[in-house]
């Protein structure tokens, strides 16, 4: 049966919640925190491995950050290959699964990507400075041409680090200096962190920053 009193109470509760939400939105509308997005190929949550246990949490700080913030999982059909396709999925919201069989986002005409809303593009429209760092060269996926359509103010690859790192710019042997930043076979995540700090020190006083790094 229709309960008029119950429905009226429910509507009042909804109205109260909406008013509270509007007040929260108004109070945070002017906040523009710096945002850093990192896709790291060298990190994963080892506690999610099936059948593996640890006496102590090896990622206690990471899990603490997850608990006090917003966290979740991202699912992709790519595993062990096609890293740039995963990047484009995240930055554009497009899913490789729905493309024609045998095609990937990386094979798109760069001009086609320009018509879609993107994460860096939305930040750019909101008044952010947007920068992309890749800890390798541009010899595989043609990232420079593809990502130039996504809304980045500037992009930096291994051959461009002197534009970010003052020590690299002053080094007598540029590539020799970069060799000191290698851990294993590739440039370390620690060096990516240093470069983010350099970008913040160069541009952080002007506008809020969106920094995207791929290792």
Which sequence ranges carry the predicted segments?
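Solvent-exposed soluble domains appended to multi-pass membrane proteins
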Residues: 12-33, 37-40, 45-215
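Conserved functional hotspots at enzyme active or ligand-binding sites that engage polyanionic ligands
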Residues: 4
């Amino acid at each position: 049966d229709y309960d008029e009193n119950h429905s009226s109470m429910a509507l009042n509760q909804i109205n109260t919640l909406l008013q509270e939400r509007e007040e929260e939105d108004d109070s945070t509308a002017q906040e523009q925190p710096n945002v850093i997005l990192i896709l790291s190929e060298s990190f994963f949550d080892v506690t999610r491995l099936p059948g593996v246990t640890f006496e102590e949490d090896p990622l206690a700080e990471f899990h603490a950050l997850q608990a006090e913030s917003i966290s979740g999982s991202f699912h992709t059909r790519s595993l062990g290959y096609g890293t740039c396709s995963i990047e484009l999925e995240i930055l554009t919201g497009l899913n490789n699964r729905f493309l024609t069989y045998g095609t990937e986002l990386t094979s798109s005409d760069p001009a086609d990507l320009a018509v879609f809303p993107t994460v860096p593009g939305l930040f750019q429209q909101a008044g952010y400075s947007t920068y992309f760092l890749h800890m390798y060269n541009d010899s595989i996926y043609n990232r420079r041409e593809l990502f130039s359509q996504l809304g980045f103010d500037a992009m930096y690859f291994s051959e461009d680090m002197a534009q970010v790192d003052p020590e690299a710019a002053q080094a007598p042997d540029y590539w020799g200096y970069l060799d000191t930043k290698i851990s294993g076979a590739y440039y370390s995540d620690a060096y990516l962190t240093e470069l983010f700090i350099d970008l913040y020190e160069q541009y952080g006083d002007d506008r809020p920053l969106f920094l995207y790094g791929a290792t």
